[in-house]
């Protein structure tokens, strides 16, 4: 269901219901981790399952639809708006590290933290909850940028290593999106058994992802994080300044409310888990990166509902 097409009172109730569902799922994940019903092995395994299996299945299922010029044009617009978002966040990030005089050892972490949000792991489930399958369809076009930039610009920010073309091309999110685009533009009808299987697998993404985020927050050590004001300011840039600039720009142009809403919501996603993964991979400040991801994720439980209520 596309929220922007619902009447005022029903819209407000629908948004409230979806936000409540998110809180319930994350809260349940937090609780079952605290009582040790799940362990680190489960959360790591679930993370891999989401990245390599359920998210690609969700994307492919959403792309199996009849080709229309309207959908294709909207997908192209969403793709271009994704580029705009990354340009805006990059400018914000570089201004931030310059004004705050961030040291060279931490600069790459802060830049990555602000530029790259959790647009896949959290973004797709939020799009599914808020907009239904069409939200996932459009988000796939939007996330082409992430899948390319994270293995090009992202690697450059965290390391002096050369960009790995192999890792770029074997990225499961990019592969699923490109295959889905081919399926859509060539109007390939997947067999009903395949489509149903993809849908069933993809439908597990939302609860799994929310559980893992809840478990992630349950394991977080906030004592040292709360003392770092730079992390708060970086989270402010990521969760508030970036989305507000997108709101100002997009609400000044003539586009459907859904096409406006998707890039704005995606711009408000917290720092991606890849921030910590890349920091560890390239011997950067892993502790700082982890604290940034935890803090922005925790704060997004406040900012994302507010953002959804403002724009939908």
Which positions does each model-derived feature cover?
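Alpha-helical transmembrane segments of multi-pass small-molecule/ion transporters
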Residues: 1-312
């Amino acid at each position: 269901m596309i929220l922007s097409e619902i009447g005022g009172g029903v819209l407000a109730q629908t948004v409230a219901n979806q936000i409540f569902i998110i809180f319930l799922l994350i809260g349940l994940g937090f609780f079952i981790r605290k009582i040790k019903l799940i362990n680190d092995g489960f959360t790591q395994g679930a993370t891999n399952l989401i990245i390599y299996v359920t998210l690609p299945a969700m994307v492919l299922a959403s792309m199996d639809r009849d080709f229309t010029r309207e959908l294709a044009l909207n997908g192209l617009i969403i793709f271009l708006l994704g580029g705009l978002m990354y340009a805006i966040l990059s400018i914000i990030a570089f201004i931030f590290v310059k004004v705050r005089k961030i040291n060279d050892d931490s600069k790459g972490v802060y830049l990555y933290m602000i530029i790259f949000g959790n647009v896949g792991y959290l973004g797709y489930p939020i799009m599914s909850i808020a907009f239904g399958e069409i939200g996932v369809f459009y988000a796939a076009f939007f996330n082409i940028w992430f899948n390319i930039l994270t293995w090009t610009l992202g690697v450059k920010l965290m390391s002096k290593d050369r960009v790995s073309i192999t890792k770029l091309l074997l990225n499961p999110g990019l592969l699923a999106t490109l295959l889905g685009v081919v399926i859509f533009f060539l109007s390939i009808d997947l067999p009903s058994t395949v489509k149903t299987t993809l849908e069933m697998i993809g439908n597990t993404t939302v609860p799994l992802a929310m559980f893992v985020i809840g478990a992630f927050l349950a394991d977080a050590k906030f004592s040292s994080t709360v003392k770092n004001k730079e992390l708060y300011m970086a989270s402010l840039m990521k969760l508030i300044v970036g989305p507000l600039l997108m709101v100002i720009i997009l609400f000044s142009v003539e586009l459907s409310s859904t096409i406006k809403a998707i890039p704005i919501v995606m711009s408000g996603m917290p720092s991606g888990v890849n921030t910590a993964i890349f920091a560890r991979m390239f011997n950067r400040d892993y502790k700082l990166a982890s604290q940034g991801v935890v803090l922005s994720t925790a704060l997004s439980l406040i900012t994302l509902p507010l953002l959804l209520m403002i724009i939908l």
